[in-house]
Amino acid sequence: AINAGALGFSTSRTILHRDVHGVYVPGTEASSDEMKELAFAVDRAGEGTLEIVSDWLDQEIEMSWMKEYVEKSDCGLTVLQTNGDSVKTILYCEEQFLKGKNVRPQFPGRNVGLMFGLESSLHPFIGHPSYKEISHLPLNERLSIMRDPAFKQKILNESPSFREDFQKAAKEQKSNKTKEEIKAEAEIGKKLISNYETQFILSDPPNYEPTREDSIAYLAEQRNQSEEEVIYDELIKDDGKSLIYACFTPYENHKLKFVETFYKLKSSVAGGSDGGAHCGLICDASMPTTNLSHWARDRSAGSKIPLELIIRKQTKTLLKLMGYLIGEK
């Protein structure tokens, strides 16, 4: 494919990437040996870029084959890490880049956020037994049931069945995942929907650098409600069209300080905006627009980033990563 004109090979190793039937995309469960073979197939082609998008459930194993590829190949590599010690990986990429390797960590211009809603593919009640009983119904029928105070109380008294759901999905897909891997994925799923300090009601226009006072945790304190009840009440507003913005990547002190830091790295490249792999949960195709509008023009939570640097990270840097503009600085 590369010899016929493909830019490279991209591999997905995150539980967020599934098809319309909920099945993991190819590569998600591949072994490190298989990944190494795929990576060096790019190398044997003599050109092209390898992209890795991974939850890094076992960081040492992922880093091991990636380091071997970097040491032996002159092809490009770009990494987007969604879990684990991403700083360690990014600093490794920066070190290798400064040594002359075309190794670039991707970073999004805003926190990767999951959109929880009654029409999304994930929200905090999707694993509750009572919600499962009505999940197949049209939105207006689900809303009618969810507005019933008795149903609301029933669902708030339940607990989601994360591990059981992941085990069932693995069995249906004839997955070779171990119990430990399924448990780890279930923990990620639980974390995704229960980190209320970094979940926010999505405003219009969206605010992608919200404060702690905007969080579900803070609203729960102010309303003297549980976080689950706050989310429940918000989800049934606006005829079920309202959305909760749940930060997936770290959002320390409710500021995007990490974006400022990564922009300054020589190796970094603007990314995380494919826009299609998880369109029922994440809407990231507007990331380039956020980079320009928020960071160069509108930001009030801290310092801005020069417009020309943002444009460079989104254009020339990307071209160099993909093997174009060879020799240019």
Map each language-model feature to its residues.
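Polyanionic/metal-chelating signatures
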Residues: 1-2, 24, 42-43, 58, ...
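Hydrophobic, small-residue-rich alpha-helical packing segments that form membrane-like cores
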Residues: 1-49, 53-72
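Flexible, glycine/charged-enriched surface loops at secondary-structure junctions
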Residues: 8-11, 49, 53, 100, ...
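Glycine-rich tight-turn/loop motif centered on a GG-T
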Residues: 20-31, 48-52, 77-79, 245-248, ...
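Hydrophobic, well-ordered secondary-structure elements that form the walls
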Residues: 224, 274, 292, 310-311, ...
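Short, well-structured alpha-helical segments that form the helix of a local strand-helix-strand
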Residues: 228-235, 306-316
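Acidic, glycine-enriched loop/beta-strand segments at the rims
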Residues: 243-259, 305-311, 319-329
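Substrate-recognition/cap regions that form aromatic- and gly/pro-loop-enriched pockets
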Residues: 256-264, 268, 273-305, 323
